[in-house]
Amino acid sequence: MAKVLYITAHPHDETVSYSMATAKAFIESYKEANPSDEVVHIDLYKENIPHIDADVFAGWGKLQSGAGFDTLSAEEQAKVARLNELSDQFVSADKYVFVSPLWNFSFPPVLKAYIDSVAVAGKTFKYTEQGPVGLLTDKKALHIQARGGYYTEGPAAELEAGHRYLGTIASFFGIPSFEGLIVEGHNAEPAKAEQIKADAIERAKALGKTF
């Protein structure tokens, strides 16, 4: 049985969002094809995702100096403990499904905060004399992203930073398989929007059977 983290970074649901509608079709297809797998939904707009702030750095610093966890302030304890929960949960999974829109050439900031929470030396990567090495070498990841315009080809391709960044992070973590399910052009060509959405949903259903 595999454990899948279904990580959504969108304030809207599938009735409004193309990425969420595509993701819903994918995850339903996946569950049907893999009924014994555990799928854990992490809605980043509803979860407590601490930012790496002064409290976190202070707490980490105290722990690294040998101080006990009980010496941390209440704020430091809460944030450090939550970050540990998130990173442990991430490492425990076998597959990751990230869902986001393309906003300002990237993704919503809550997804960056989540990535920061799981990018932990000794858990998702380690330092060696040759440089950092990823530790998640037996995992796989998928990014479902909707883009109102066209960014796969042409001059705008260099502007898209969200999907490319997630690919970089996956590689940094050692994840050998990173796929993209991209939905694009529905704002650029409104007359084709419903067909674009329908095509994406069909692709999602097919991928859900094999992911």
From Swiss-Prot:
- Could you tell me which SUPFAM superfamilies the record lists for this protein? Flavoproteins (SSF52218)
Kindly give the Pfam families that the UniProt entry links to this protein. Answer: Flavodoxin_2 (PF02525)
TM helices/strands, residue ranges: none
Question: What GO terms are given for molecular function?
Answer: electron transfer activity; FMN binding; oxidoreductase activity, acting on NAD(P)H as acceptor; oxidoreductase activity, acting on NAD(P)H, quinone or similar compound as acceptor
For whether the record's keyword set contains Cytoplasm, the answer is no
InterPro entries per the UniProt record, alphabetical: Flavodoxin_fold (IPR003680), Flavoprotein-like_sf (IPR029039), FMN-dep_NADH:Q_OxRdtase_AzoR1 (IPR050104), NADH:quinone_OxRdtase_FMN_depd (IPR023048)
| Class of this enzyme | oxidoreductase
Coiled-coil stretches? none
EC annotation from Swiss-Prot or TrEMBL = 1.6.5.-, 1.7.1.17
Cofactor note (record): Binds 1 FMN per subunit.
Per its UniProt record, what PANTHER family does this chain match?
FMN-DEPENDENT NADH-AZOREDUCTASE 1, FMN-DEPENDENT NADH:QUINONE OXIDOREDUCTASE
Q: What does this protein do?
A: Quinone reductase that provides resistance to thiol-specific stress caused by electrophilic quinones.
Q: What is this protein called?
A: FMN-dependent NADH:quinone oxidoreductase
Originating organism: Bacillus pumilus (strain SAFR-032)
The gene from which this protein is expressed is azoR
